């Protein structure tokens, strides 16, 4: 591949627990994975590829002009899948930063994809991610909404101390809804996938805790709104309404 410093990888698989086959589900005339691909391309931060173990997904992405890398089917997480894809696409190590964009974010804004790179301007940061302020009690109490607890570093940035499904932190002040978009330094991703699942990762079912427990630094950029992920049939209908206009 041509020399570049940033690569965007979109892991996609058909076997989602709550909505099987979702990458290929139609939203406003295009498969969901193609919407995500288009938004990643619009961010214009580097080459984009879909990492998948499914020929059907690969065929659709290729038919829409996208790049695909085939990966093994037995990866325990999306991070492992993107590391295999990175190793195949860039065996010589030209890529310095890898953005892991979930394949179920069809309404994500290109600005958000660009924003996830900003914390990596600090060389002390290993991994960057995003969050948005929580504004409702329902969101705050929902265990499916992952909260990030962090030390403020200016107005729009946190240094992550913990991620949890609980309602936290306690007391007055903002709470933040974590957005599952990551930018890794290459060495950080390589280290991360070499580590075994950590105790808190297993307890909370949040793989980013593996990095924190290993002493890696995760910084969080604050954005205005949470992009709508598609995990359920109701989410799919919401995305269809949003993208129909």
Swiss-Prot record:
Organism: Rhodopseudomonas palustris (strain BisB18)
HAMAP family per record: KdsB
Pfam family, one: CTP_transf_3
InterPro entries, per the entry: Cytidylyl_trans (IPR003329), KdsB (IPR004528), Nucleotide-diphossugar_trans (IPR029044)
SUPFAM superfamilies assigned: Nucleotide-diphospho-sugar transferases
EC numbers: 2.7.7.38
Annotated function: Activates KDO (a required 8-carbon sugar) for incorporation into bacterial lipopolysaccharide in Gram-negative bacteria.
Protein family membership: Belongs to the KdsB family.
Swiss-Prot/TrEMBL catalytic activity: 3-deoxy-alpha-D-manno-oct-2-ulosonate + CTP = CMP-3-deoxy-beta-D-manno-octulosonate + diphosphate
Taxonomic superkingdom: Bacteria
Protein name as catalogued: 3-deoxy-manno-octulosonate cytidylyltransferase
GO molecular function: 3-deoxy-manno-octulosonate cytidylyltransferase activity
Keyword Kinase: no
One GO biological process term: CMP-keto-3-deoxy-D-manno-octulosonic acid biosynthetic process
Keyword Transferase: yes
